[in-house]
């Protein structure tokens, strides 16, 4: 006789009453740390200190035009004047930046 046949011969029984499930205690609320204190901010940065703008470059004065001698009066024994050597300017100007 199988297990099912044995079950069939027994009179019907009401299903057992299950006890209500035992629940654990509800979870305690999570313990939060104290809220963070507001960050301590430093003073705003001062504006950067810039050096004074560069002064304009100091240029030497342009060389004065050469002082030319008057043309020599024509002379029969010296038809042409010798070339006049002009002294160079005392100050040499720096090359101009392009």
Curated annotation (Swiss-Prot):
Signal peptide (residue range): none
Keyword GTP-binding (UniProt): no
Region (5 X 9 AA approximate tandem repeats): 21-65
Subcellular locations according to the entry: Cytoplasm
UniProt keyword annotations, A-Z: Cytoplasm, Keratinization, Repeat
Keyword Repeat in record: yes
Main location: cytoplasm
The Sequence repeat ranges on this chain: 21-29, 30-38, 39-47, 48-56, 57-65
Role description: Cross-linked envelope protein of keratinocytes. It is a keratinocyte protein that first appears in the cell cytosol, but ultimately becomes cross-linked to membrane proteins by transglutaminase. All that results in the formation of an insoluble envelope beneath the plasma membrane.
Family label: Belongs to the cornifin (SPRR) family.
Name the record gives this protein: Small proline-rich protein 2B
